[in-house]
Every structure is written in C-alpha cells, then in structure tokens.
From Swiss-Prot:
Protein name (record): Dibenzothiophene-sulfone monooxygenase
Pathway: Sulfur metabolism; dibenzothiophene degradation
Induction of synthesis: Repressed by HBP or sulfate. Part of the dszA-dszB-dszC operon. This protein is expressed at high levels (at protein level).
Binding residue positions for FMN: D59, T106, H156, Y160, S231
Amino acid sequence: MTQQRQMDLAGFFSAGNVTHAHGAWRHTDASNDFLSGKYYQHIARTLERGKFDLLFLPDGLAVEDSYGDNLDTGVGLGGQGAVALEPASVVATMAAVTEHLGLGATISATYYPPYHVARVFATLDQLSGGRVSWNVVTSLNDAEARNFGINQHLEHDARYDRADEFLEAVKKLWNSWDEDALVLDKAAGVFADPAKVHYVDHHGEWLNVRGPLQVPRSPQGEPVILQAGLSPRGRRFAGKWAEAVFSLAPNLEVMQATYQGIKAEVDAAGRDPDQTKIFTAVMPVLGESQAVAQERLEYLNSLVHPEVGLSTLSSHTGINLAAYPLDTPIKDILRDLQDRNVPTQLHMFAAATHSEELTLAEMGRRYGTNVGFVPQWAGTGEQIADELIRHFEGGAADGFIISPAFLPGSYDEFVDQVVPVLQDRGYFRTEYQGNTLRDHLGLRVPQLQGQPS
C-alpha cells in the first residue's frame, strides 16, 4: 500500500506590526505586544504544538517612505516595516522555548558581510540543535542602501550575481570545520585538531574572506537555505541554491506554473528537484460556519486604509504613487509611466491582480489586504483543510505558508481547527520524526566540502 504523501506547513510573520494583512494590527482580537519576547515565544509554542515544519521571519532594512517621500503614511498609518525587529535575535528567543520547530530568519546578502552571516546562522543552528534556516534576500530599494551608507541600491541582476558569490563564501565558511575537528580531550590538553580546521581564502569579483569560521560544523551539516525571489534571475538563483522556496501566487493555475518552473530551474542546475521544497502562501480566515468566516474576512479587509497599501506598493514598485490623486484610474497611471519611459513593476502587479480598471484608492485597499498575491480563504476548519488538500494534490506546492490574518490568534485557530483535520486525513504529521529542520523537510545533510589548509 502506497503511503500518503504529506504536506509541509510553515508560519510566516513579521517581527513587527504588519505581515501581509495591513489592517491586522487594528483587529479587535490582535495583540500588539510585538515588542515583547513572550509574544514570539507564544507563537512558536503554538506552531510547535501544531507540528509545523518551521516558521520564518521576513525583514526590510528601512521604514517605508517611498509614498510621499515622508513618514506620514508608512509610520503614521502603521505600514509594512514601520516596526521591524532584527529577525535572528527573535529566532534566538523562540529557539529557547521550542525543541523541534524549525526557525528561519531573513538576512540580506547585499548589506551584511558573509563572515557575519555565516557566524550568525552557524551559532543559531548550534544553539537550536540544527533547526535553523536562512532566508536569503538581496534587499529592495535605495532607502535600504542609504541606511548602510550607500547612495544607490545595486541593480537587480547584479545583486543576484553578487549573491551567488556570497553563498559560495558563506558555504565555504560553514565547511571550514571538519565533522570531528573539535576534540575536547581534557587529559591530553587537546581542544581541537588544527589540521581539520581550514582557511577558506575566498577571493572573488565582489568579496574577499579569509576564514576559518569560529563556529564548528552545524548539527544538520548546514542551515537550510530558503529563498523567495520569483523574477527570472531570482528563479535561477533558487535553482542553484535554495532548499526551500517561498512563493506568492494568487490562484491554483499560477501556483502550478510557479511550482513547475522552479522545479525545472533546480533540475537545470544539476540538483535533485525533490531536495527543494516549494511553499506557497495562503491566508485562512476561520469561523464556525462559512458565513461567519466570510464576515470575519470582510471585517479584516475593512481595516485597511487605502494609502497604507499604496505605501507598500510604492516601495515594491519604486514609484511614488502619492504623486497621483486617489481617484486616478490605474490604467491612466500606467499610461503616464509608459509615456515617460519610467521602468516599474507596477505594470506586472496590475496585470497579475487584474487591477487595471481600479482607481488608485481601490488598488491601495486591495494591495493592503494581501499584497496582491496571497489568496484569502474564508471557511470552517474542514473547508480550509479541503482547500489545502485540493491545492496540494493539484500540484500547487510541497507545502503552505500560513499567513496570519491577525496575531497571535490566527495561528491558535489554525492549529486547533485545521491541523487535526489534515492529520485525520493523513496529509500531515501527528508527531515529529526527527530533531532537525532537515529531518522535518526530508532534506539530505550536505556533504562536507573540502577546504584548503
């Protein structure tokens, strides 16, 4: 008898006020205790109780001020990134109260040196017993660059070229200690075998790193590499490096195409597609009936101010949308940008979300509900489980990112109402079968790569 294939589940939320649902902080049931370690520890314990594979935290390195070139909207209305705690520090807080749950943090490969990144994640992996993932990003805009003393953000494809070399350097550092390099022979006075600890001497186009790292090899070999870039260059990067991919897609058809496209990139890079797990994001809103759940969804979306969505959209597209009146049709804005030969991702967003006929205010409200691409599903626990299974069996993903409607209650509801249904139907684990994140995801331990002495 063939064993039922099981899905993976991941939590995803900002260490701050807003993730995808921009009105979440205003929800009557939301806790705005996001500056407290106990807040994150509660969420981590909840997801571990639900046997989730992992949770991971996004990050941005600047307050959103692209809309209006000021802080009035991004900060005043509580936009995405108004508050953003440093993710690796939050992961350490959550690792202390969990034993199995995988924990991921986002750190930019553009604005931090590889030695620092390698050391941070090697340390977290040691302290957590091999449960850590690095979500690799290349950052987004000039506002982030200026916070690191750089006037202009590196061009998109060049950022990925640099990130390729960055990953090479980080992995060399993670491999600079052999498995048995640490001896700890008290009687003989031998702490470690220096012949098994190696300089990396990386000298490339972008980076120079001597090594070795000061942290021995991870309990899971290396931290898991997670990546979320879905541009053509980002997909090639994922094909080369990613062991888990975070995808945003508005419907089953796009999810399927994204899934197949990324798996093809992994195969083209000479890697095993089964060793890269693809997650797609969904936002469940639960209720004791379909009608109640739909009412709760409508309430959640009513909390979104149009301009707070436009603040995030301005940051994502690089266009100051405050330059246009709120009643301007999107098609007129697109025509104006095209006439002025202004390159922007706004055309792609508008086409993908069928927003060309909306006004700017309507698009802002829509974007603020789910950043345009995260499906919002309203239903009972049984109905949400049905949708997850339908998409899983339909080839949408290997697993799902559960984006919270509000925190921390959305995760409590999901674990109590959806997870048991998935478990009863054989689509999700009832117990953890291993200790490391690689165990949970079914990923092989990377072979130790040799280093020069």
